[in-house]
Amino acid sequence: MRPFSGSDCLKPVTEGINRAFGAKEPWQVATITATTVLGGVWLWTVICQDENLYIRGKRQFFKFAKKIPAVRRQVETELAKAKNDFETEIKKSNAHLTYSETLPEKGLSKEEILRLVDEHLKTGHYNWRDGRVSGAVYGYKPDLVELVTEVYGKASYTNPLHADLFPGVCKMEAEVVRMACNLFHGNSASCGTMTTGGTESIVMAMKAYRDFAREYKGITRPNIVVPKTVHAAFDKGGQYFNIHVRSVDVDPETYEVDIKKFKRAINRNTILLVGSAPNFPYGTIDDIEAIAALGVKYDIPVHVDACLGSFVVALVRNAGYKLRPFDFEVKGVTSISADTHKYGFAPKGSSVILYSDKKYKDHQFTVTTDWPGGVYGSPTVNGSRAGGIIAACWATMMSFGYDGYLEATKRIVDTARYIERGVRDIDGIFIFGKPATSVIALGSNVFDIFRLSDSLCKLGWNLNALQFPSGIHLCVTDMHTQPGVADKFIADVRSCTAEIMKDPGQPVVGKMALYGMAQSIPDRSVIGEVTRLFLHSMYYTPSQK
């Protein structure tokens, strides 16, 4: 008896194919085969893209709809109106200033330049010095400004790209990184670099993990898994480096990422898991220990974004407040981003990206070995970097010292908790989740919360507007720890809310109405176009068309 072979299983299939194509010409067989293969490849491409069919279909629908003449004219009319509104606001803000669109024929004197600088710095609609602004300016001490101004002046010409010329500046950067590593419980293997801000810290981490995964795991279609509340810089990094960002819903009660959904979002192309400490919208901290455990289980690096939390989140437990572990003391955490220009109180333009091991930092670097100009390497996005900013950051940290930062942390978090207690019992509003450090986010189930924002704005307060769901938040800084500021905020929130509650059904009007309207527009590309027009308006000059 003939032994059974694999070809016996295929025989019915081959015979069926031969019967189906037996009466066809060779060119027909080739055409059908090619069409079937190409059709299968196309179908696979359509189904297996990073975005699901619903999102892609919705985008294509709106793209087609905007080509309809009547729709296109309406969109163009609204965009033109938005452009005019933005430019009108800029003109109004700078009405008392003269625009310089060409170089002065002869250079201006020191006195004239300083006079013009003072004029420019006096513009603005809010008094940040009196603690009326959410975030933005995290601390202001004249003696510290005097110190960093002098330090920056001494180091303004330096550039760590030229390490042989300015080794002292390189040493300062190394010390800033090491001091930050120690604050976040890094060991002797921890390392990192300074950057120009939180966004660069985040995108550098994404670049490092993309390259690391490509070299050691062969991943060429990378994705990262993040909470929906994570900073928009991760979306920017995704656009820059062709990394798909998989956003996961947060729990509607805690406003921390839903760990079960987070786990389901991980796949074989995931190169990074991300958590916030805290997130920008609500000031809550994700369960970093749970995220890190997933990282260990699936051998995926874990990044903690502490850009907003900065040195406050690093020291809040030492200041007497309870907080779950979130930094390098958690097994599985491989990197942390933190802004020294926020609660490190350094001048704007300084942040750090920290790694648990140099094997990750190594992939952050860009190295070109075959350039005719020589072997070229740079640690961050910029080649030339401002040594003056590095020196000023270093000087700020040396000036504050550990005790100074601990005292500032206690002041800020004490004030934030005081404000939280004061507004939590106000009828008509609620607080999103449990604020972990300095951000307090307010919402309402009774009235449009943007009415409260508008009322507070008229009293001189400048808060951040949130969407999906609607909310506003106050990011408490050292400016709010000044005597009377917290009490004034609580009193104004209470009185404004009481007035709104007399007629809670009234719609919001004025500028804040735009935020509510923006959320209701299903075609988010239109909102994107409006945002681009706003960004263009920031560069307005009278002669520009």
From Swiss-Prot:
Identify its membrane topology class. Answer: Single-pass type III membrane protein
Subcellular localization is given as: Endoplasmic reticulum membrane
Q: Which InterPro entries match?
A: GrpII_AminoAcid_Decarb, PyrdxlP-dep_de-COase, PyrdxlP-dep_Trfase, PyrdxlP-dep_Trfase_major, PyrdxlP-dep_Trfase_small
Q: Which reaction does it catalyse?
A: sphinganine 1-phosphate = hexadecanal + phosphoethanolamine
**Gene Ontology CC terms:** endoplasmic reticulum; endoplasmic reticulum membrane; membrane
Q: Where are the transmembrane segments?
A: 27-47
Report the principal subcellular site: endoplasmic reticulum
Q: What does this protein do?
A: Cleaves phosphorylated sphingoid bases (PSBs), such as sphingosine-1-phosphate, into fatty aldehydes and phosphoethanolamine. Sphingolipid catabolism is required for normal development including viability, reproduction and muscle development.
Q: What is this protein called?
A: Sphingosine-1-phosphate lyase
Q: What is the lineage of its organism?
A: Eukaryota, Metazoa, Ecdysozoa, Arthropoda, Hexapoda
